């Protein structure tokens, strides 16, 4: 899933009065609100069956008569004191136009157009308009309907090339333009032969700028020899008032299918295309489905509708607000300036009862809040912060908001919660589209108009309707408000409908409950980076947009790169505080990093660098659509070249920095080189890399750690194992200390190269001689050491915080504590206290009984020492080493660096040299039997029938290859440990018990105790998260049916008990045990899936294995990072083909099974069969740990 995927649920409605109570209170004390209550009788007359759209509009406008319909800011003509020019100065009040006056103005315009002597316009022709929403614009738009014209509202941010293309496609007879956009209109009209009239609206008589704009337009047209007639709308209305009203459009054969409106989409993915609105669809804006589709769920029809409209009529949202208010008898107030600079002033004057916001407006409100906090030095949540919210609500937003909604684009839960906290009302989440109409309200389908829906798999992004726990995919719907398609674009229309007639929204959603959806992302907003990671650009922008320093941000990426860039517009406050240079860039970088940490984003989701843009993205500069959405093609067109150059510069800088680090390393402190190398390889600034930071905290993983290790080795000529770099106990300062220690000691410790030869591709048992690892004195004394103690009272355990190690610690404590004995464990940590805390944490899985049991035993018989078994003397203080050499009776070496990707050379230090250090302690002062935990991977490369369970490993596997096979390095390193212990047995008679485990499964009793990183847990999690499994994990029989197969795994509780019991008996000799499950019981992966399905987990089977694997991988890549990290994706190559169907274990387990039976280990006194209870517990434990 995307986000287990934990989809945010809607916040509870803010506490307080119900909507009905708030409406009643406001109406009782506010005459304007009382006068704006809808009239049911008007609505019934206007929406009766059989009325054409023009008749419906006329019924509303005449029905509400003298009520105020529209309001615009009043202004006065003043003289500019500097230029002396006549300018318009806004006054702190609005002037209104009544419904009756609006109808008369619209009729006058229609009459003048129809009866013009030189260029009459008739029904069926097109009228294009461009401008900011206003009284004039509304009048002209309604006039078009009365005359039977097809309206083509154009986006004010469109380029002239786009405008000309649309005009060419629609061939308008009339072009209406506001003064602000008159120049573009003239350019378009000159290129469009069909245009006969150019109407200028929002013309302010007496304002020099407006007069000059109209004169310039007439001059340009005249000079070009154009016959286009230019009139102001006021002139048209004045002439039209003297003319008879035009007859409303009569019924036609097309009826309400007549084309009434074309809404051209923003073109966020390319050339705009005109969505066709027949009359019946436009009618839904006027008291129809659109009107109440996004109202609050408990709204009553008597909510007074007073709104401020800032949305353009070229966008559906602008029409919803305007026409919805006009069909409710309310008043629409228009924002005074298109750049929204008067936003708060207009709202405080208008005092709306209903709000409709888009995320861009909510972000603006949030930034105002943040700026006020910064100005007074207050913190969020403080009394001063609440006072700012109160001022926002009561003064700047008018103080009488009853309902509020948001739409046009998804909004983050955090921003939603903030707006609700300001307004103290529920913010309705409305989702719809230009083509389909309203789709959901507060995530629940709006029915009607939606009649059917389905989710369509998006395999390339990993979204499937079979996903668990929620189906995901592209939302496809059938709806009563669906449009017939795109104007003159039959091919494009066909692309957005499937073969069953469902409209393809292009939006990926998750169905979290029946007919309840959560938006995931636009299908085209997801980018795959070069390393295979998917990033959702719009989600990242929403997250980073909450920064108090970010005004706007556009995240940029390329599938040829492994990281992201961005274009960032800082807030005015940020620019005022930091300037527009490196200071603001540094502050922004810190802010983005902080948000990334808070949001749990991955390193590749954080822009590595960005361009600072001081000019905001606007409609005017073409970066924003009329609805305020960032147009990615426009961003790419404007900044793409600079961003690609930045990519090249970063790559060159990294290469140069690495060269610089190499050249001057000998003259710098080691820690400086370590920091700079980490910064260069991980794309960070060296100044920002703290020496106390852990490599993984900087975004590093095991593979980047390998690159880092090799680079440091190249510089310092000492081994810097990956185990040192990725150790939870180590930071960069620790890495530097390791290097300094290795350099000062002369690095005489054994290495892969000194033992096997540099660049060796095969390794031999004969290479691994004790004299290469242990000092001559220890080896000389070993053969004559006292024999092991007759009674085991003190056990030394390594790897106790590992998966098996924790239960070995528990098992030994259970045995020794009642006898007064103790268990000593070595754990990495900066000191003993930190080491103890690391061990304690592995028992905190959510099972209080386990934790209490461990703590009780630990208090009585556990000693924790900070150390590292791969270091000299196990990383212990000399006094502790000497004491343990005297006290310890038996050593259990469970510790290892378990990594199935790293090569043998990188695992040589922790796993081979570490085992030699254990052998050294076992051969000091007196012999101490060793229990050694090995792996089934040791058997790789040897025929199963030839792999002798209790044979001499030096003969059974004398020569091994080094290759890139799965777990080759790990298997070789554990094999080498076995060889060394066999050498110690042969040299000094050291008793050894080797246990080679295959899959060690979850604990059958304790909650949450499973090995999250192992392949089996990853597979179960992945099956549950994706909801798909193959028909069979094994090769099918000749008829295509499933075959009996067996899964070789043993629960950890039994494994620990068996190893402890058999290890305790190992006071002499050398014996090996293959800890496998040998039963021929037909219990395999297919049965595990059966059991999960029977337990109610939704998993669908895919018949074709290759198809399943492809879908499975795609789904896994689409999981949220927290799940993807723990999925089987890194190990998916193990499932590349169906496995052979083997019912039983291919390896010999006779020695282990007979020893278990003889010692009566476990309740069954035998190796247990796997059962349904354990597999179902896996699912429960995975959920318990928060991974689903």
UniProtKB/Swiss-Prot annotation:
Function: Catalyzes the ATP- and NADPH-dependent reduction of carboxylic acids to the corresponding aldehydes. Catalyzes the reduction of a very wide range of carboxylic acids, including benzoic acids, heterocyclic, phenylacetic, phenylpropanoic and fatty acid substrates.
Organism: Segniliparus rugosus (strain ATCC BAA-974 / DSM 45345 / CCUG 50838 / CIP 108380 / JCM 13579 / CDC 945)
Gene3D superfamilies: ACP-like, N-terminal domain of ligase-like, NAD(P)-binding Rossmann-like Domain
Residues covered by the Carrier domain: 665-743
Annotated effect of mutating residue 998 to G: Does not affect benzoic acid reduction rates but leads to alcohol production. Displays modest benzaldehyde reductase activity
SUPFAM superfamilies membership: Acetyl-CoA synthetase-like (SSF56801), ACP-like (SSF47336), NAD(P)-binding Rossmann-fold domains (SSF51735)
EC class of the enzyme, as a word: oxidoreductase
Cofactor(s) recorded in Swiss-Prot or TrEMBL: pantetheine 4'-phosphate
UniProt-recorded name of the protein: Carboxylic acid reductase
HAMAP family named among the record's database cross-references: Carbox_acid_reduct (MF_02247)
Keywords: ATP-binding, NADP, Nucleotide-binding, Oxidoreductase, Phosphopantetheine, Phosphoprotein
């Amino acid at each position: 899933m995307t986000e287990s995927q934990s989809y945010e649920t809607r916040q509870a409605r803010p506490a307080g009065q119900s909507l009905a109570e708030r409406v009643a209170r406001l109406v009782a004390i506010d005459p304007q609100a009382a006068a704006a209550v809808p009239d049911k009788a008007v609505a019934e007359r206007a929406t009766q069956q059989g009325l054409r759209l023009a008749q419906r509009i006329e019924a509303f406008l005449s029905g509400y008569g003298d009520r105020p319909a529209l309001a615009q800011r009043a202004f006065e003509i003043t003289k500019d004191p500097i230029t002396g020019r006549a300018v318009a100065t806004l006054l702190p009040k609005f002037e209104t136009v009544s419904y009756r006056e609006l109808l008369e103005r619209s009729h006058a315009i229609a009459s003048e157009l129809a009866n013009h002597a030189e260029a009459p316009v008739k029904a069926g022709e097109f009228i294009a308009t461009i401008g900011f929403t206003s009284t004039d614009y509304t009048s002209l738009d309604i006039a078009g309907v009365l005359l039977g014209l097809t309206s083509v509202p154009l986006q004010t941010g469109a380029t002239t090339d786009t405008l000309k293309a649309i005009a060419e496609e629609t061939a308008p007879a009339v072009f209406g333009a506001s003064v602000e956009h008159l120049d573009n209109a003239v350019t378009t009209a000159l290129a469009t032969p069909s245009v006969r009239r150019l109407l200028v609206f929002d013309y302010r008589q007496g304002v020099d700028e407006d007069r000059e704009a109209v004169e310039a337009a007439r001059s340009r047209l005249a000079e070009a020899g154009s016959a286009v007639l230019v009139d102001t709308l006021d002139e048209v209305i004045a002439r039209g008032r003297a003319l008879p009203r035009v007859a409303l459009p009569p019924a036609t054969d097309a009826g309400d299918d007549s084309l009434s409106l074309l809404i051209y989409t923003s073109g966020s993915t390319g050339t705009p295309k005109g969505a066709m609105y027949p009359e019946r669809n436009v009618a839904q804006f006027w008291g129809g489905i659109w009107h109440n589709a996004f109202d609050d769920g408990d709204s009553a029809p008597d909510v007074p509708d007073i709104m401020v409209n800032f949305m353009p009529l070229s966008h559906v949202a602008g029409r919803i607000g305007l026409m919805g208010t006009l069909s409710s008898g309310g008043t629409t107030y228009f924002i005074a300036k298109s750049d929204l600079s008067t936003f708060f002033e207009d709202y405080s004057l208008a005092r709306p009862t209903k709000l409709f916001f888009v995320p861009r407006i909510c972000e603006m409100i949030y930034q105002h809040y943040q700026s006020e906090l910064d100005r007074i030095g207050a913190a969020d949540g403080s009394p001063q912060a609440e006072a700012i919210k109160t001022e926002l609500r009561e003064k700047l937003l008018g103080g009488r908001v009853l309902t509020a909604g948001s739409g046009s684009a998804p909004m983050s839960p955090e921003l939603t919660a903030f707006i609700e906290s300001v307004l103290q009302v529920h913010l309705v989440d409305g989702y719809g589209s230009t083509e389909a109409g309203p789709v959901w309200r507060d995530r629940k389908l709006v029915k009607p108009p939606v009649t059917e829906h389905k989710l369509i798999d998006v395999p390339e992004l990993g979204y499937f309707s079979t996903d668990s726990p929620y189906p995901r995919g592209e939302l496809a719907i059938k709806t009563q408000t669906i449009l017939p398609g795109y104007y003159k674009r039959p091919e494009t229309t066909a692309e957005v409908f499937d073969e069953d007639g469902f409209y393809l929204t292009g939006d990926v959603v998750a169905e979290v409950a029946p007919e309840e959806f959560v938006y995931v992302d636009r299908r085209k907003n997801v980018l795959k980076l070069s390393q295979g990671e998917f990033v959702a650009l719009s989600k990242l922008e929403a997250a980073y947009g909450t920064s108090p320093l970010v005004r706007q941000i556009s995240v940029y990426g390329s599938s040829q790169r492994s990281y992201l860039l961005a274009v960032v517009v800082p807030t005015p406050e940020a620019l005022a505080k930091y300037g527009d240079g490196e200071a603001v860039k540094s502050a922004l970088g810190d802010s983005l990093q902080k948000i990334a940490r808070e949001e749990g984003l991955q390193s590749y989701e954080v822009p590595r660098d960005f361009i600072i843009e001081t000019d905001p993205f606007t409609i005017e500069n073409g970066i924003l659509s009329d609805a305020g959405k960032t147009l990615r093609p426009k961003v790419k067109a404007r900044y793409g070249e600079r961003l690609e150059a930045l990519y090249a510069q970063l790559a060159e800088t990294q290469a140069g920095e690495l060269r610089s680090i190499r050249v001057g390393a000998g003259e710098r402190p080691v820690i400086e080189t370590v920091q700079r190398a980490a910064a260069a390889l991980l794309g960070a600034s060296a100044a920002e890399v703290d020496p106390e930071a852990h490599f993984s905290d900087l975004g590093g993983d095991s593979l980047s750690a390998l690159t880092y290790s090799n680079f440091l080795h190249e510089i310092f000529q000492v081994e810097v194992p990956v185990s040192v770099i990725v150790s939870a106990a180590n930071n960069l300062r620790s890495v530097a200390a390791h290097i300094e220690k290795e350099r000062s000691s002369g690095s005489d410790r054994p290495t892969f190269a000194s033992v096997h030869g540099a660049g060796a591709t095969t390794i031999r048992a004969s290479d691994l001689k004790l004299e290469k690892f242990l000092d001559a004195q220890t080896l000389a004394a070993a053969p004559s050491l006292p024999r092991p103690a007759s009674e085991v009272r003190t056990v030394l355990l390594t790897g106790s915080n590992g998966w098996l190690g924790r239960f070995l610690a528990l098992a030994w404590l259970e045995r020794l504590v009642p006898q007064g004995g103790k268990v000593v464990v070595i754990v990495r940590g900066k000191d003993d206290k930190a080491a103890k805390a690391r061990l304690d944490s592995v028992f905190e899985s959510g099972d209080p009984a386990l934790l209490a049991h461990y703590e009780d035993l630990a208090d009585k018989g556990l000693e924790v020492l900070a150390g590292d078994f791969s270091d000299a003397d196990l990383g212990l203080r000399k006094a502790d080493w000497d004491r343990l050499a005297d006290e310890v009776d038996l050593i259990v070496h469970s510790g290892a660096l378990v990594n199935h990707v790293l090569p043998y050379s990188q695992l040589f230090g922790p796993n081979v040299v570490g085992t030699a250090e254990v052998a050294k302690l076992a051969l000091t002062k007196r012999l101490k039997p060793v229990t050694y935990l090995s792996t089934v991977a040791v058997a790789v490369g040897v025929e199963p029938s030839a792999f002798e369970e209790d044979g001499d490993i030096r003969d059974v596997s004398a020569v091994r290859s080094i290759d890139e096979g799965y777990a080759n390095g790990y298997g070789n390193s554990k094999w080498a440990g076995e060889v060394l212990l066999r050498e110690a047995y042969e040299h000094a008679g050291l008793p050894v018990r080797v246990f080679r485990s295959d899959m060690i499964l979850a604990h059958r009793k304790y909650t949450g105790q499973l090995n999250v990183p192992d392949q089996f847990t990853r597979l179960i999690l992945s099956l549950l998260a994706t909801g798909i499994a193959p028909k069979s994990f094994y090769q099918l029989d000749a008829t295509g049916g499933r075959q009996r197969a067996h899964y070789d795994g043993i629960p950890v509780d039994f494994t620990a008990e068996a190893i402890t019991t058999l290890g305790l008996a190992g006071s002499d000799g050398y014996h090996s045990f293959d800890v496998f499950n040998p039963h021929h019981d037909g219990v395999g992966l297919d049965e595990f899936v059966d059991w999960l399905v029977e337990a109610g987990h939704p998993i669908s089977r895919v018949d074709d294995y290759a198809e399943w694997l492809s879908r499975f991988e795609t789904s896994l890549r689409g999981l949220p990072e927290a799940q993807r990290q723990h999925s089987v994706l890194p190990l998916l190559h193990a499932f590349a083909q169906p496995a052979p169907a083997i019912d039983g274990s291919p390896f010999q387990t006779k020695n282990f099974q007979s020893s278990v039976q003889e010692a009566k280990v476990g309740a069954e006194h035998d190796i247990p069969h796997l059962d349904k209870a354990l597999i179902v517990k896996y699912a429960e434990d995975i959920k318990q740990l928060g991974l689903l």
